[in-house]
From Swiss-Prot:
One of its GO terms (cellular component) is cytoplasm. InterPro entries: ATP-NAD_kinase_N, ATP-NAD_kinase_PpnK-typ_C, NAD/diacylglycerol_kinase_sf, NADK. Involved in the regulation of the intracellular balance of NAD and NADP, and is a key enzyme in the biosynthesis of NADP. Catalyzes specifically the phosphorylation on 2'-hydroxyl of the adenosine moiety of NAD to yield NADP. This is NAD kinase. GO terms for biological process: NAD metabolic process; NADP biosynthetic process. It comes from Burkholderia cenocepacia (strain ATCC BAA-245 / DSM 16553 / LMG 16656 / NCTC 13227 / J2315 / CF5610).
Amino acid sequence: MKTGNQFNTVALVGRSNTPGIAEPLATLADSIATLGFEVVFEGDTAREIGIAGYPALTPAEIGARADVAIVLGGDGTMLGIGRQLAPYRTPLIGINHGRLGFITDIAASDMQALVPVMLAGKFEREERSLLEARIVRDGEPIYHALAFNDVVVNRSGFSGMVELRASVDGRYMYNQRSDGLIVATPTGSTAYALSSAGPILHPQLAGIVLVPIAPHALSNRPIVLPDDSKIAIQIVGGRDVNVNFDMQSFTSLELNDTIEVRRSKHTVPFLHPIGYSYYTTLRKKLHWNEHASNEDDKAS
């Protein structure tokens, strides 16, 4: 296990069904092993790329055995393995092999230079919060899930508006007619919530944001809540209503079902290269107006 900031066992996780990912993963594995680290692979990744010579483990086995997981893929890959490793507090290093790369912040072209430095203990660490949600039907919980980005209650593409009753900490907030409601973490505030005109929350802000999706009343605006809030969303009206967790798992809902959402007790450690800036990520990914001559403020 760890000695200070040092790691012994490194797990590699790759984006599934991705052409061209086998070679960089194999190269990365060999280079890490050459440095003296034990390298293991997530089982599905190992099978898909057909790599041999390294143990293939389940996410639970990775959580129990690995000191750090390196994820080569897109944000969706990072979200998926992050939820599975959250109970084990396994730190994640994200290498972008997808499109956007908000949370996989290392370019694939930089991984051979940056990963050895980070494995030697030179990195910046931050904790990312998750949500836990459960569906209650007739007074009994019927489904439970974690979400890294968001919990989204919405209508299907062929039905009309839904009516939702929202309360926070047992206090009634409103009834809302809309296409749905997003409950997002700070990490998820730059995902679906942002496209629905929600605010950007810094990842270290202790908050949860509620963002209506195409509300009938324009006065239904996003609201940021303390991250210890307990949110309940009841299905009052509408047909074909679903709830999604990070857009990677979903279940159908019935009238009077209640979705209860709160901050999870788990957090996921993200490791970044020295000098990482969240604001640089925002500028690059959201294409904010910037001038090449601008730099971070100099320390006075």
